[in-house]
Structure formats: structure tokens, C-alpha cells
Amino acid sequence: LHKHLDGRGEGRFKGSAFVRDRIRGKGGGVSSTATHPIGIFDSGVGGLTVVRAVMERLPRENIIYFGDTARVPYGVKSPDTVARYAAQITNFLLARSVKLLVVACNTMAAVALDTITALSPVPVLEVIDAGARSALAASKTKRIGIIATPSTIASQAYVVALRRIGGPEVFTAARACPLFVPLVEEGWLDHPATWLVAEEYLGPLLAEHLDTLILGCTHYPLLRPLLGEVVGPDVRLQDSATAVAERAAAILAEFGLENPSADPPRYTYHVTDMPHRFLEIGQRFLGRPMDDIRLERF
């Protein structure tokens, strides 16, 4: 059973009737599974960009978030290592009875998606297809830049997705930006060092006359104000958070998994290191209290 869902939910999700039979109650009604949480995971704080979009689009849904803050960044690690970490986190979330998994990490989506889907009996959403579709919808010239971690860039996952969806005429220019993730994790969202790094990374891309830039790591939207200043008003910045939230809503509706409860949603955050730093950055970004942060050890 292959449970990976692309941005359209077409062609990549086999066995949907089997899954529907397992998660619907007898007679087609909604089972208690509908009140189960959505599991969202990333290498660190960056996946909160997706959490925020899901909270806004699906305000009744319970969410469990896992940020692997002890082992961030993932983008400079080998595919085998990333796959091993992804398997650990997937099993952690499945043990907590999530009804949907959202891979809010471009590196894991690029190099470990098969590992995740092989383990999961619930639908799996990922960010790369959604980000590619969002960029193509925004671009007028089909000249699209991609910034991401070294692992994501090396995988060519975005280039493949853009050309599969938009055709071979799509022009792409890509740049690995390994320092952005640690800068975001440090909370240096408007620090002089971050400005210098951004100008160094983005200068060669701007010379390619792009009209759209994919923020190909879920950490990068936290730098959106700074990056917008660096690239200027003629370049549209695109990420996948909103598109993933929309697709999550569609999947829950399709399988009768929308939470019917009128109770306030429960948000739980699990991290592997520095919970106080995670709290500081996370509350600033989400604009709401983060009352339940738990430290986990693997």
C-alpha cells in the first residue's frame, strides 16, 4: 500500500478504498479516528511554518509536532542518515495514533519519502510537489529559482517536479544555502550576519533574471521579510505551507476524518533539544502560546 499523496492527490495514492475502510466507522460513519491528531514533523523549528498554515485552515484539528532540534540541520547529512532519522520520527508519531502525516521538511521529502510511506498506514503529505505547483502558478516567465539545503538541491527533487508539472521549458536555477537553517534555529531572523549570508547566496541567482524563488526548506519562510528585501519586488517568494494545508483539508474531507469536536484543539510539541529556544522562536512566529512542549530522547 503506497500512501504518498502529491499536491493533486492523483496517481500517487494507491489503495484508498482500503484506507477508507480502515478509518471509517461501520456503515460509512465517521469513526473516533476523526478526533485523532495530525502529525507534522521537521528537522527543527522550520516546520512551524506548516503548522501555522494548518492551524489557520483547520482550526478544529489537534496537532502533534515533532522538531528534531538535537540533530538539525538535516540538509548536510547523508540520505541514509536522514532516512534513519525519518523512520524514528515516523514511528514516534504513529505510536501516538495520528490520522495524517505531514512531512514538513524538504530534505526528508526529497530523500526519505519512500521510507516514511513504507512505515505509515495513514496518508502522507509532503511539501515538494506543493511548492513546485505554487511556484508555477505564481511565475509569469517560467524562470524559477530554488534555494534549499544541500541534500535537497543534490536530489534535484524540485527541478524534476517543476519540469514534470510545468514542462521542459521551465528554466531553473538552484542554490544550496546550508547556513540559513542554523541561523533560523539561532533566532537570527534579522541579524547582520544573516543579511550578509543572504546577499552572498542570492546574488548569483538574481543574475538569472528570475521572477519566482522557491523557499525550498520550511525554515526559510521565517526569513521571508529579509529575503524579500534582498531579492526585491520583482521576484515572488513561494513556499508550500498554504498548499499543504489546503491538501490536508481535502484529504480529511475525502476520508471523513474532519474533527467534529467543538472542544478547543490540542497542540503538542515534541523536540529533542533546547525546548526553551524552540519556545522563544516558536511563539514569536506562531503568534500564540505554546503551552505543551516536551523533550524527547532517542
Pin down the residues of each PLM region.
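Non-catalytic structural scaffold of enzyme domains
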Residues: G28-F298
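Compositionally biased, low-complexity flexible segments
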Residues: G9-E10
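Intrinsic-disorder-associated, low-complexity terminal segments enriched in Asp/Asn/His/Tyr and depleted
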Residues: H2-H4, D21
